[in-house]
Amino acid sequence: MLSSNQRKLISQLDKKKHRLEKNLFVAEGKKVVSELINSDWPFKNLFSTEENFHPDVELLTLADMKKITNFKTPSQALGVFFLPKSKKILSEPITIAIDGISDPGNLGTVIRLCDWFGISELICSKNTVDCFNSKVIQASMGSIARVSCHYVSDLGATLTEMQKPIYGATLDGDSIYSNKLPNKASYVFGSESHGISKTLLTKLEGKLSIPQFREGDNKVDSLNVANATAIFLSELFRGLKIKNG
């Protein structure tokens, strides 16, 4: 049975301030919660409408799940997990950096894309949405268990210290299809509405873009960052596969 204290805690964890204070976050959905459990992520509570979900599960009715869900339709499982300890940035050959994304769904999808392409860390500006926001966790579909998100106060300085060329995804850059994308570099993606910050633009070795093939005046203004990241990573790793045979 769900206690009032448990319900209050889960409600509080919807805000970043309380997540940091209590060192906890909430994950919803059977797949997402299972991914975290299978990665040995430490948890405080596990709730489910299914008795056989996990040996330590607290069985709840659908009515109780509705009281604690952040979504319109309650899921079969919800977990309260501990925030991870800070990790050192590894600076792998390919670094993906995010500048000022505020949409949780977009960030969660980017995390999932990084996981798909074998990228184990993501560097984020301090004004990017918190990766432990429950909607980010949901959109990542469990990939948050395998991709570390690092939040830095000065994204430009952090990327410069890695001593790799920095490229930015912009609307006015060179086509990714007419240039060989470097296999040791940092790639920066900004928000659809604001793009990459002016300060960070000065740090770029070059600008890259996805050409639009629709002709005429009635064109799409831009792609959202998740779509753009998917296309960039696909082209980048296609080039790496060709190079490596």
Language-model region placement:
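Boundary-proximal intrinsically disordered activation/regulatory segments immediately upstream
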Residues: 1-49, 128-130
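Active-site regions of enzymes building and remodeling cell-envelope glycoconjugates
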Residues: 54-66, 93, 165, 180-186, ...
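Short acidic-hydrophobic, aromatic-tinged amphipathic segments that line or gate anion-handling sites
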Residues: 1, 27, 58-61, 146-155, ...
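Active-site/ligand-binding-proximal alpha/beta "capping" segment
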Residues: 168-219
